[in-house]
Amino acid sequence: MSLQFVDGIRGPKTNAAIERWVGGSVDGTLSRTDVKALQRKVGAAPDGVIGPRTMRALQTKIGATKNGSRHLDRATVRSLQRYLNAR
């Protein structure tokens, strides 16, 4: 699942790695179904919307700094890329 890069940008390669991690179909775009799978993976309520609760759960799961973000910000994406690279 290794991305081999850490740039903080959630582009198609990062999206595809997230999809593989959560067991979704891999097309490089995060669908509502993918987001729900991500939420289940990190222990957040699966509503299909990335908000502050999902971000806190994701940041906890991957060991990222909890920064109060309401979306997949660059710092969290960078931490997620590192986490996925280590898998």
Predicted regions and their residues:
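Cell-envelope/ECM-targeting effectors and their regulatory/trafficking segments
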Residues: 1-87
